[in-house]
Amino acid sequence: MSNLLWKSLVVSPAVLGATLLVSSAAIAATNATTELSVTETVVPTELAQQPEIVAQAAPITEDTKVIDQVNRYSNEGKGNAQSQVTSVSQFSDVQPTDWAFQALQSLVERYGCIAGYPNGTYRGNRALTRYEFAAGLNACLDRVNELIATATADLVTKQDLATLQRLQEEFSAELATLRGRVDALEARTAELEANQFSTTTKLVGEAIFAVTDAFGENTGDANNTVFQNRVRLGLQTSFTGRDVLTTRLAAGNATGFDFRDNNNNSIGASGQGLQTFQVGSTGNNNVEIDRLTYEAPFGPAQVYLAASGGRHSHYAAVNNPYFFDKTDGGNGALSTFSSENPIYRIGGGAGIAFNVPFGQGGSILRPSSFTVGYLASDANNPGPNQGLFNGDYAALGQLNFSVGDRLALAATYVHGYHGASGSALFDSGANGAIVGTSLANNNSFLNASSSNSYGLSAAFRPSDKLSVSGFVSYSDVTGFGANDDREVWSYGIGVALPDFGKRGNVLGIFAGAQPYARGVQAGANEVPYQVEGFYKYRVSDNISITPGVIWVTNPGQNSNADDAIIGTLRTTFTF
């Protein structure tokens, strides 16, 4: 009995192999009608499953996952294993020798409906699963439909149309399955695209190291070489992908220089010679929240909402490229005067602003916009003569025009109210002068005042290597006490050479008159001119070094004060 069993086991593989060979030949025959027995159909199925069992024992790799997926696609849609196999539509694979494979290959070469390989060929020496074949067939169907839709149907022959129809009928089940899967994937993709954004917060930082000193007679003697710093860490949060909530932490120890007259008397609080990194000093590097703003689109308009630290130059077009950098940032001009028109320094704090575009058609003045904003310095204070509307405030209106892509213009009006607190006119809502002489800034400690300011600014780029910008502003300050009225003027022009010597470098020269008051004090009617030159050298995308010189004339509008020169070496790290 055991010998008989042993011999049966030895002979069985040969019998099975012969059976499989005969079965395959019978299936490949075109007119084959012989029915296979139950055992003949089950045996090939069992043999086909054996490699899968072996593969499961091997380590799972990416290639294995791909093969398993292909096998699953191949096994989908199969009928009963005991049914008759007489049609090519019931093969799990389509061989290169099959008529369907050769017909599709001919269509591919003729119409170029599959171009997935680098050389544009179809590589017809490899077997395909029925779903892979159906995918190629679907591509050819789409290509032929495209040719017909574009009135090039004469390129498609009747023979090719007949071949496509036969292939479509032969692989109708697979085509329907694939198209169903594609529709489902497209629906899921559309859903993901519509809801792909999630609330994210991005850190944007800037650190400034600066070595600076002031020279010139008494002013030079009263000041020493200093090493100052400022750090800003901005948390930018977006909820929709189109808005941004900015929460900025700042720390710094930089202060401005003490200007002296020829009698060695301090000229007084002013913004002359003040540098951008000296704005927002927190004493001994104490950390403060110096900006809390939210910006979002509202229909065609852009809305700016400031809870703290709002500035007009946050939302209004300044038109001073290469000199202005994110409101006293570390990659523009050295001085606050060269950075932006002083009119944007009137007021600041909390409030709201809108920027509404217009003239989007074929007008030469495009794109154009109208900007309005309101900022209150003491919006959080509920005390008398304080708050959002009863304290110091500044309301801005500005028309912005662009003539082509090379010229930008802006006309600005700012109305301000200044309480009897002795705050500076150009203080950005921080009570200390940012630009201008002390006479231009001083508001009465006894009486309130109002101001109406008018400004023009322009930026012109005749070429990518040259930028010219400038501004002029006039303020009519009306005090509510005797001799409190004054007129304040300021103007300036700058020339910048971007990419000078190297991509990312900037050579800039700016000259003009700091804000000064006319006819308010005898012997103090000189125009305080200022000239600045700097060269920003780009070390990398995140580091720049800027040496520069600032020449300040007639400090305090006083002819009895010698000129002063400020030398600075600024290093800026951005991340």
From Swiss-Prot:
PROSITE patterns: SLH. Residues 87-151 form the SLH domain. Residues 1-28 form the signal peptide. Residues 158-196 form a coiled coil. One of its GO terms (cellular component) is membrane. One of its GO terms (molecular function) is porin activity. GO terms for biological process: carbohydrate transport. Keywords: Coiled coil, Signal. Gene3D superfamilies: Carbohydrate-selective porin OprB. NCBIfam families: por_somb (NF033921). Belongs to the OprB family. This is Uncharacterized protein alr4550. The lineage of its organism: Bacteria, Bacillati, Cyanobacteriota, Cyanophyceae, Nostocales.
